[in-house]
């Protein structure tokens, strides 16, 4: 699967649990909201002088004003459904915005072979 196709799958899955789902940034007015982003390539493998397996890592953040927001469980459900590795990295109350902020780190490994472009 191509990199962009896999990333689109991730975004579509999160958009399935809330209309307030953003890639890289968040609208200040829409809460609760999810922001997800890929951040880097992690340990990957090359063979025959080309990428044979690629691991991409990223984050998904939930911003809410609701204590014990059920959307947090839905995010974890999506991560499990996607078949990615993940960890709940932090949960914090942001005093400057009065928001509860959950952050998960995720990683996905897939065939990194890229089709040659004409």
Where are these regions (language model features)?
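Long, contiguous binding/interaction regions
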Residues: 1-57, 63-118
